Each structure stands twice: as C-alpha cells, then as structure tokens.
UniProtKB/Swiss-Prot annotation:
It comes from Xenopus tropicalis. One of its GO terms (biological process) is protein homotetramerization. It catalyses: Thiol-dependent hydrolysis of ester, thioester, amide, peptide and isopeptide bonds formed by the C-terminal Gly of ubiquitin (a 76-residue protein attached to proteins as an intracellular targeting signal). This is Ubiquitin carboxyl-terminal hydrolase 16. Zn(2+) 3 binds at residues 71, 74, 91, 100. SUPFAM superfamilies: Cysteine proteinases (SSF54001), RING/U-box (SSF57850). Residues 162-196, 397-497 are annotated as: Disordered. The gene is usp16. Zn(2+) 2 binds at residues 45, 48, 79, 87. It holds the Pfam family zf-UBP. One of its GO terms (cellular component) is nucleus. It is an enzyme of class 3 (hydrolase).
Length: 864
C-alpha cells in the first residue's frame, strides 16, 4: 500500500512551498555560482581589483575594503551600495534577458533582492539555503588556509624585527639600561590595546559580539584588577538609623567565579599573541548563572549583556556583604548585623564596579495640572532601551479596519520582517494542521475570557482596600502624615506588576482554579521585576489604585516578559518611596512580600484571602496624615535590588521639566538615535485611564466633604504631565535599539537603518539638576567606541561587532576608580582605528562603514 506523500509533510515544507521572494526561481543558478568561485578572492570586488591593478595605487594610500555582494545568478562579486563605485548595483542595473536581482553578502551572509528591495530569509527556501550553506563552508575553509599562511608570515617578520632591535640595543646601551628597557617595554606592550578574534562555540555570535565590546572598554579591566586585589579597604555607607555612618571593610575573599573568568578573559585578550581566543570559560559561567543560554541556540545579545553584568554585580555585592558582617560582628549583635546588611543591599549603598561603570539614574517628573504638585521617581539603569518607530506599523494599523484579508496577506509578504499569525493555517495545509490551528484559536479565546473574568473579580478588592491594617495604624498614626501624590501607570512597563499579579492570584484562588503554592510562587517571581534599562512608572501607594489600573498593563508585553526572564540569575528590583516636604518628621512602612508569602503558605485556604489583603492594605496610607517623609519598601528575595525613590517636592512648575540644554534645535530628521532618545524622554499627558491619583486634591475634597457632613471618601483623578529624563549619567552609556517587536502573535524585525552619531550630546535628555557635571556646563558629550550589528531576520541572523582601537581614557578611569570629575569636559573624540569582527574574522574598516551599519547595541564612553 502506497502512502500519500502530502499527508505527513512537516510544517517547514509549507513554508518552502511559498518562498518570500517571487523572483527566487529565475534569479538563482547554483551551477554558475559554483563555477565562478573557483580560485578567486571572495572578499574583494572583482571590478575594484581590476581597477587597482591598472591604476597601480601606492602603498601609502588607504583603500577602504567595502562589503562584497555575490550575484546568485552568475557569481559576480561587486561592492555594495554604500561604496563609491557600487559595482554590485551597477551589475544588477545592466539590461539582461533574465534578472540578476538576487545577491548574497559574503560578510554578513544575508540575501537581498533588488526587485523586492527587501531581505530574503534563505532558511525558508531549500534551494537558497543549500547554496548558502555550501558557500559558507567554502568560505570558512578558504579563510582558515589564508589566515594560517598570513599568521606564519607575521610571526616570521616579528621574530626578525625583534632580533634586529635586540642587537642594536645591546650594541648601543649598557647592560643594566638594556634590562630595564626590556622590562618596561614588556609592561607597555601588555597594556597596549589589541584586537583579536573569538572562536564560535556554536551559535555564540551573540556572545562574541558583546565580549568584543567589553574587551575594548579599558575601565572594565582596571576595575576587575582592583576587585581582584585582596585585603583592599572598601568604605560602605550605612543606613541613617545606625550609629556609625560608614564602615570600612577589608575584602579577604576572592571574587566570584564569573568575575574571575571575566578577568582571565580580558587578560588573555590583552596579553596573548594568538590571533584567536576561545572564551569557553566565561560562557560556561554565564550558562551556570542563566541556564537559558545552554544548548548553543540563537540568543539575544542585549539579554546576554544584562545577565553578564547582573551576574558579576551580584557576586561583588555578596562578597562585600560578607566582609561587612565580619567587620561588624565585634560591635553589634547578629540580628542587628543582618538588618544593616539587608538594608544596605536594599538601598543600593554597597559599592560594586558594575554600577560604577555602567550604572546611571533616570528621573520621572510628574506634575498635577490641578494643584501643580510635582513628584519625582528616581530609578537606576544599566542601559537604555530606546523604542524604534516604523511607518510600516502605523500604516498597517490604519489599514486593519479597511483592508480585506487578501490584501493583509500581501502586505505581510512585502514587509521587511517576518510576520505570521500563530493561529493562521496555510491554504495548502493538511487537515491535521487546520485542526491544530482551530484548537489554538479556541485556546486563545478561552484564555482571553478567563483574563476578563479574573479582572472582573479583582474589582471586589476595592472595598477591602479601604480598611486599614491595625499594625500600620499603630506605626503611622503618631505623626498624622499623608503621602502627597500617587500616580497611575500609563502604557509603559509598570513597577506595580507584581502587586497586580497578587490580586489576580487572589481571584484565581477564589475561583478554585489555582493552588496556594503556585499562586505564591508566581507572586514572588513577578514582584522581582527588573526595571533597569526599561521605562517604568511611579510607585503605587494605594491598593485601590492598583486594582483600577490592572487593565492598563497590556501594551509592552515583550519588554515585561523579557525583563521577567532576566531575574533568574541576578539581583532584582525593590521599591523605596520617599516623600519629602516641609515637615521633617518621618515614618516608615515596610512590606516584605516574601515573608508574607512564607506565612501564607502555612495558613489554610480560608485565611489566605485575609493575609493577602492585609499585605495589600499596607500600601494604603492613612488619609488623616499630614505630608512628611514616608517610605514604602518591598523587599525581594534576591541579593541586590534596584531601588526606586519616590519624592514629592515643592518646585516651580515652570522649571519642573527643564533640561540641561535646549531641545528645540535637535536635528530630528528621519530615523536616528536622537529621534529615539527624544521619543524616550518626550513629555506625556496623562489623561483618560492614565490619570493621576493626586492625594493633595483628594485631601482637599475630603475636607470639603467633612464640612458638609458626608462621610464617604472619594479619590480624585486629575490630568497630569510626565517626563522621564537622565539625572545621573553613566560613564559608559549603552543604548539598545528595540528592533525586535511583538504585537500579540505577530513577530517582526525593523531592518531600517537608524542613524547614530560618532559624538553624542546627552544634555538635551538630562535634567537641569544633573549630577556629576561641572558647574556651568551645558554639554554632556559621549564618544562612540563600539557597535553590535544584527543582520538577518527574526528567525535567523548573525551578530557582529565594530570596535574602536584606541588608547585608554585616563580621565575616565580616574573618574570611575576615584570619583574625580574634571572641571572641563573633552570636546573631541580620541584618535583610533575601527575594526569589524565577525567571530574569528577581523577586518579594518572606515568610520563611514561603521556609521552605515544596522546597529542593535551602541556603546559610548563619556568624553572627559
């Protein structure tokens, strides 16, 4: 009995049946390409090579090596459109009977169709994928042979040159002077910057690109050398409540395994004479911190960078905390020591080299338009994730209601990313696939109904939230204070997501669809939300306000999921709210959600609701209280949280949103990093569902109601203005361009070129009271020294690095190590040469080639 061929075909065959590019069949000729690439130089444009031979260029003239594109019809090798000659584009424009529109970049291994003017994912076509695999194998084999030959010649030349120098020195100088010069030259050579390739351990290009940029950050090596020094005195500021203000500890323990592996890697990159380094030890330590990187799968460079920095940060904080406990054990009790160490970790007063180099601070300013009360929310960051807007998204959203289904499918094919509905079945799919798609659609609808049902049940908490916890009344009542203002989160990532999840878990428990253990596990996980490098909202100080804003947390699902995943192996965020006004008295309310969780696990199911409600009620402050200093702290079950400071200030509303320099003259032309920063820091208006819960206006209305003998209290929501600016710039500024976007089940990558400058002025995006800036300075300049580029699509791609080889910035190192800020900032970037590194392949490039790359991560260092 013969089986039907189409019945058990895999899902990938349905993708191959409909290639992205409709010109693929006529524009691809495997035989001609293989014949044309016999005994030729792959990485050189054949027309430029012929022109150079005719012109006989001199050796002192620097000729740029542009990117080479291979015609997949005839095997022609031409330079790209970013070069001066554009031989590949001219080859396509030459009239022929058959199109030569399909080309392949031999540097990035990405296919492009000139007719479609779009990238072609070669993994969706068996013919194109097999040809690209064949070319990659041939290119690797050829590069290994040429690299080994070139390496032998370089080694021989170095040996001859060293022997000649030794002979001349021995003849001209005395013996003692020659020995001293030899030792000093060896030391100078070890600190001289170098560029080396990295071995690909198996789909680890995302890791290699990050390590290349970190290896060209000289301050990292200086800080690691200092951290490796044992018995080094470290001064740790203690909380204000303790008797001593500072404590000096001596670090007698070695740094953690990840920190040591990083130090060994940077030392090998700087001192080894090998052309290629294998970063196996560092990668294995990262995999131990975050098991998601195991298995040699394609990963994200920005996530790898965050896991790496957070891992080293957590190890250093743990080492300093142990030294603190040991130094205080002779003067304080064990319980007091634990409290001090825990409070220091929560307030982020424990010094560590990661925060010193990459850490900065953002300030979100919120002003009520009714009473003009100004509140500030301070939060730290390690990198800035900038939104990348694309006109394709706006166009598709505007045409969703009017365009029919066939036109939508045509738009998806012409788009520059991969977009596919998860519940969509192809027209030629089998009955099994169609049935599977229907089940997925039903499951999605069921989940949506359950979410709506859960949101409806959480409204019941508003009545419970009005009651005061007895413990909090005893602690707050003596001072009769009240917090000034609360904010409702807008459509960005909210810091109250963990508390919203607690209320959702309570509704699930009422419905009987979830156990206590699973609910509390998700509560402790969701409250550990990492807010570094992402937009976060102000601290929620009222349980009723949190309940009413659960429906506003659905827009940035990708960032929330991404951030939650980062909490597996690193320190996580906590919130510290501080309201400072005229009265100097202070009260503190501490809520430990992990301790509450442990207590709830011991309770029965009947007492679960009451305990969880009490934990939520602790966030609601008494309405009888005058404004003083109030602190709300949620202590996570992690080593080192990121801290947020909420304060209400008396400031002139006219200067509340002032910046370090004017924003009017910014060149916001097209798609650029300046446009992304402007969008990230633009002033918003909180209206509608995002209105501000202002306690000042609420207190005024409550006083009027009391005069009219109406006992029921109502909360006042007002329109407000909000702006997020940089208040403490980091020495190393890392910018993450969010090219990968997810809207529901739609996945896409924005392949559009984003302009980025060599010198970036961050002053228009900083507050007027920015820290660590000389007095009277109106500029904050950063110099570009590293770029991570991603080429490819959502489903497959390749990460490469551009690094600037330069001498270390001594002023920046002194600022990071000693905290010395020079009075005058630098105005010109340091001299250096740029290199493009793709795993083990290193190539010198020009600055124009760097600025034309498709950047995903940008590394800037402060100019001092």
């Amino acid at each position: 009995m013969v089986k039907k061929r189409g019945k058990n075909l895999p899902a990938q065959d349905s993708l191959d049946a409909e290639p992205v590019c409709k010109h693929l069949r006529k524009a691809l000729d495997e035989g001609s390409v293989k014949k044309a690439l016999v005994n030729v130089e792959w990485t050189v444009c054949q027309e430029c090579q012929a022109d150079n031979k005719e012109k006989n260029n001199s050796d002192d003239e620097l000729v740029e090596d542009p990117s080479v594109w291979l015609c997949l019809k005839c095997g022609h090798r031409g330079c790209g459109r970013n070069s001066a000659s554009q031989h590949a584009l001219n080859h396509y424009n030459t009239p022929r009977s058959e199109p030569h529109c399909l080309v392949l970049s031999v540097d990035m291994w990405s296919a492009w169709c000139y007719l479609c003017d779009n990238e072609v994912p070669y993994n969706r076509s068996s013919r194109l994928g097999q040809l690209v695999d064949y070319l990659q194998r041939k290119a690797k084999a050829k590069s290994k042979s040429t690299d080994s030959a070139a390496l032998d010649e370089e080694v021989k030349a170095e040996i001859v040159a060293e022997n000649e120098v030794k002979i001349e020195d021995q003849e001209e100088k005395p013996k003692g002077q020659a020995k001293w010069d030899k030792a000093s030259s060896t030391q100078n050579n070890s600190t001289e910057p170098t560029v080396k390739g990295l071995s690909n351990l198996g789909n680890t290009c995302f890791f290699n690109a990050v390590m290349q940029n970190l290896s060209q950050t000289p301050a990292v090596r200086e800080l690691l050398n200092e951290a490796k020094t044992l018995k080094k005195p470290v001064t740790v500021p203690l909380p204000d409540s303790s008797s001593p203000t500072n404590v000096e500890v001596h670090l007698e323990q070695q740094p953690g395994p990840l920190t040591l592996a990083m130090w060994q890697f940077l030392t090998e990159m700087q001192e080894t004479k090998k052309g290629v380094v294998t970063p196996k030890e560092v990668f294995s330590q990262v995999c131990k911190k975050a098991i998601r990187f195991k298995g040699y799968q394609q990963q994200d460079s920005q996530e790898l960078l965050r896991y790496l920095l957070d891992g080293m940060r957590g190890e250093e904080i743990q080492r300093v905390s142990l030294a603190m406990s040991k130094s205080l054990q002779n003067t304080l009790d064990e319980e007091e020591i634990k409290k001090i160490v825990k409070d220091s970790e929560k307030r982020r007063t424990i010094p560590n080299f990661v925060d010193h180099l990459f850490g900065g601070e953002l300030t979100s300013t919120i002003m009520c338009e009714e009473c003009h009360t100004v509140s500030l929310v301070h939060e730290p960051f390690l990198d800035l994730s900038l939104p990348v807007l694309d006109d394709v998204i706006v166009k598709k959203n505007s045409q969703k209601s009017s365009a029919p289904a066939p036109e939508r499918k045509e738009e998806e094919e012409n788009d520059d990313g991969y977009i596919k509905e998860r519940d969509e079945a192809s027209p030629g799919a089998s009955k099994h696939l169609q049935k599977k798609a229907k089940k997925a659609a039903k499951k999605q609808a069921k989940n949506q109904r359950r979410q709506l049902k859960m949101q409806g049940k959480t409204v019941l908490l508003t009545d419970v939230a009005k009651q005061e916890c007895s413990e909090d009344e005893e602690e707050i009542a003596p001072n009769n204070t009240e917090s000034e203002a609360n904010t409702r989160p807008d459509d960005e990532v909210p810091i109250a997501d963990g508390l919203n999840t607690m209320k959702s878990d309570l509704s699930a428990l009422e419905n009987g669809s979830e156990t206590i253990e699973s609910a509390m596990e998700r509560v402790t996980e969701d409250t550990d939300l990492d807010t570094s490098g992402h937009n976060t909202e102000s601290v929620e100080m009222n349980a009723m306000e949190l309940v009413r804003n659960m429906e506003n947390n659905n827009n940035n699902n990708t960032d929330v999921n991404k951030t939650l995943e980062r909490t597996e192996g690193s320190g996580v965020d906590s919130m510290e709210a501080t309201a400072a006004v005229d009265n100097g008295n202070a009260d503190t309310v501490c809520v430990d959600d992990t301790e509450a969780a442990n207590g709830l696990l011991d309770c029965s199911a009947a007492s679960m609701d009451n305990e969880l409600t009490n934990s939520l009620n602790r966030l609601k402050l008494s309405s009888d209280i005058e404004p003083t200093q109030v602190e709300i702290e949620i202590l996570p079950d992690q080593q080192q949280p990121h801290t947020q400071i909420y304060e209400v200030i008396n400031e002139d509303p006219k200067t509340a949103f002032s910046t370090l320099s004017e924003r009017k003259d910014l060149p916001l032309d097209g798609y650029s990093v300046l446009s992304c920063l402007y969008q990230f820091t633009h002033k918003e208006t909180l209206t509608g569902n995002n209105k501000l819960l202002c306690n000042v206006c609420t207190r005024k209305q409550a006083s009027r109601l009391n005069n009219s003998n109406k006992g029921e209290k109502t909360f006042v929501y007002t329109n407000a203005k909000k702006q997020m600016l940089v208040s403490d710039p980091s020495p190393i500024l890392t910018l993450h361009l969010k090219r990968f976007q997810q809207n529901g089940f739609n996945l896409r990558k924005i392949n559009r070129h984003i302009k980025f400058p060599e010198v970036l002025d961050l002053a228009p995006f900083c507050t007027s009271k920015c820290k660590n800036i000389p007095a009277g300075e109106s500029r904050l300049l950063y110099s570009l020294y590293g770029v991570i580029e991603h080429s490819g699509s959502m489903r497959s791609g390749h990460y490469t690095a551009f690094v600037k080889l330069r001498r270390p910035n001594q002023q920046l190192c002194e600022m990071v190590l000693k905290g010395v800020i020079p009075e005058v900032s630098g105005s010109e970037p340091g001299q250096g040469s740029w290199y493009h590194i793709s795993d083990s392949h290193v190539q010198a490039v020009s600055l124009s080639r760097v600025l034309s790359s498709q950047a995903y991560l940008l590394f800037y260092e402060r100019m001092l």
